[in-house]
Regions:
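Structured secondary-structure scaffolds
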Residues: 1-112, 134-177, 181-182, 195-208
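Acidic, turn-prone loop/beta-hairpin segments
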Residues: 113-143, 174-252
């Protein structure tokens, strides 16, 4: 259950009281008490002060998912949020923009080569170090994000997903691997690059789906076609892909 802090002696209490009287049991075992949404200066929003932001206008301008992503990754749900429309613009440009560019990069070269993820999976030990590093980071991310969601920490989960997407996939892997997609022949190295990037994008779509359900669903359908991401299996980390030493050495 989730409600504002003002409902501590209202809705929260009423549900427990009624459930105990009728069913002799508590109504819920986990509760999130939402903080207040303030203006960018930390003042309470009000029509009188003229500092209120129209949520429907923001959704119309940026979309529901960028707005939700900004609010969840900016502060924990139980903390007060200083809302700044510039922050929504930044999230749209950096995270969603980078993610869209990365998908477009993959789609462009895949269409040119007629590539589909139908070929046999290239074994991990036969992939270049760059690919093994990224897959190690991806599987570490899966474990961390799963733990965050299970502990009701969506803010940490969103920040981890965003950092991986922007820093490791877009700014690092794609930039350093561009030439691998240029060759005419479908070499094992090129195949590995395709499979690695595809796997990352597909997994990102699944991991981000609780926070950005519409964008994640579109990304997943564009990649895999067919059913919704919300009907897919939640990704499971492969410990055999995780190489902590490789991750540390690449971080240096």
């Amino acid at each position: 259950i989730a409600e504002g802090v003002d409902q501590t002696r209202g809705w929260f209490y009423t549900l427990h009281a009624l459930s105990t009287m009728i069913f002799d049991s508590v109504a819920y075992r986990t509760v999130i008490s939402n903080g207040l949404v303030l203006d960018k200066n930390g003042m309470k929003m009000s029509k009188r002060l003229g500092n209120a932001v129209d949520p429907f206008g923001a959704i119309e301008q940026f979309g529901a998912d960028p707005l939700r992503w900004y609010m969840i990754t900016n502060s924990a749900p139980w903390d007060n949020l200083k809302f700044d429309i510039e922050g929504v613009k930044e999230v749209t440009r950096t995270f969603f923009g980078k993610l869209a560019q990365t998908y477009s990069f993959l789609a462009m070269y895949a269409n040119v080569d007629g590539w589909h993820y139908e070929e046999e999976e290239i074994p991990l030990n036969e992939r270049p170090e760059m690919d093994r590093w990224l897959l190690s980071c991806l599987n570490s991310l899966i474990k961390e994000v799963k733990q965050c969601y299970e502990e009701y920490e969506p803010t940490k989960a969103g920040r981890l997903i965003q950092a991986f997407t922007v820093d490791q996939v877009s700014n690092w892997f794609v930039r350093l691997s561009k030439k691998r997609f240029w060759g005419n022949a479908m070499s094992a190295d090129k195949q590995s690059a395709y499979q690695t990037l595809y796997t990352c994008l597909e997994t990102i779509a699944k991991l981000m789906s609780p926070i950005a359900p519409f964008y994640a669903d579109q990304l997943y359908r564009d990649l895999a076609g067919g059913e919704s991401v919300h009907l897919s299996q939640w990704p499971a980390a492969n410990d055999g892909c995780i190489n902590a030493e490789l991750e540390r050495s690449m971080a240096l």
